Amino acid sequence: MAAKSLKSEQRKYVFLFLTPALLTTVAFTTIPALTTLSYAFFHWTGFQRKGFAGLDNFHRLFSFPFRDQFLTALRHNVLVFIGIFVVQTALGILLAYGLYHLKRGQRFFRTVTFLPVIFSLVVVGYMWQSFLDPYFGPVNHLLNNLGLDFLAKPWLGSSTTALPTMVFINLWRWVGFPAIIFLSGLNAISTEYLEAARIDGASEGQIFRKIMFPLLGPSMTIISILTFIGAFEWFDIPFVLGGVSGNPAGATDTLALMFYRLAFGTADSGANEIGVGSALGVIIFAIVGIGAAIGSNILRRREVEQ
């Protein structure tokens, strides 16, 4: 009886501590998601709901004039995911490996590596706009002084360089996060495996390739999931540096920016299209949800295998 009473008391405390998080999730995630889903199936005039639309809003999204915008934005999101995942993961592993082998000052360099992650987006945007200013920015000034003036260009003003530049800025800001995740994964590896490999004559490169890298699988999956979600919800940096229209000339447009334009309307895009915007929101949610579910399933399998 005493054991049952203790378990019952523990359940009460567990429920008590989980309640705030559950209420927050329901209020700020579940309810808005369900509301957006319902909006997608109605016609709208401004912010006034009209009759039931069925799948008409989805049909309009894949028809002129929204189809080309959608496909362009989707392509940009896919390119952003590929670029960020490949480069950020590689740099994150290299940084983590370097930090792992530091004998002194690891805490300091770990802090420096993670510092850009906590910077305000306003600060990041203003700083990089200043750095990349085509006339007064230090980047073009340095290139000109080095005799590389042919490389100097309006990095954020050219349709060929704007998106890669924003991806680079995103990498600079977030690379510290996967580095810390991978560092935690390296620290979790038993030193017995490493010492046994060294005794057998394995080099540090062989130890990394044969032992460390495979055991970073769960960390790699976590980073993959978070990168996928972040890439297909990418809004902040393009919005701050390119505006809601994905300037220049839509070269940095993303699904999230398109959703914003459709849901709220802009001076360039005209009046809002809540129904079509909500349909786009549902599609974004489905893409992110399916990607996250696949990644979570892979992560569970790797945990079972290990």
How does the language model describe each region?
Residues 4-306:
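A structural signal for multi-pass alpha-helical bundles of membrane permease subunits
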